[in-house]
C-alpha cells in the first residue's frame, strides 16, 4: 500500500540446457494484487523481459503504474483485472497487456501500447474480454476484441495506419472530443481500441493529424485539450457494444519477439 517503487532490469535471457530464465521487473509465482502507490518498471533485456508478471491472477485496484518492457508489460498466466488506478504500458517487442485467461477492466485509466502485428495493445487470446468502466485505450498491430455480451460499456476498434507524433481524435456529432491521443510510434498497420463512459449510442467522426492545445496528457492520452485541424479518417455509429471500422486486426495470436524500439520520454531514470 502506498509508497514509490522503481525497478530497472537489463539482463538478457539465460539458457542452461533445457532451462531458461529471463530478467523480469516484478514477478510473482502466485497471485499479485496492486492496491495503490507509484510503481515504475523498466525491463529492457530482451525476449522474456516482462515488466510485471503473475503466474496466477493479477489484480490492479489503484495506483500510478508505468511499465516499459521489451516483452509484455503486464502478463498473467490466468486472469487480469483492472478496477482502478492509472496504468500505462509500452512494449518494444510484444503486447502491452497479455492475459492468458480473461481480461476485465471496470475502472481507472489504462493506456496500452504494443508493437506491430501480430502483437497487440490488449491480448487475451480467445478468452473473455470484459469492459464495464474506465477509460481504455489500446494500440498495436492488433487487439483482442471485447466480448460484447459481457460488456456494459461501449468500445470502438479502428484500423488504419499511424505515424509517431501524429494525433488521432474521436468527436461526437456535436463536436465534443471523446478522445485525443498522440500515436507513440509508426504503424504500417495500426489497430486502436477505445472505450469510455462517454461513448454512447450515437454518431462519431475519427480525425487524424491536426494539433492540440491546452489540456493535460497521460502518456499521450489528453484530457481537457482543444483538438482541431485534423483530417476526417472515418465515421461510425456506436449502436452496438463493440463497433469495428477500418482495417482492424484481431488479436489472440501467440506471443512473439520483436525488434527494439524507442520509448516515450521520461523513462531515463
Regions of interest found by a model, annotated:
Residues 1-269:
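A composition-driven surface/loop motif
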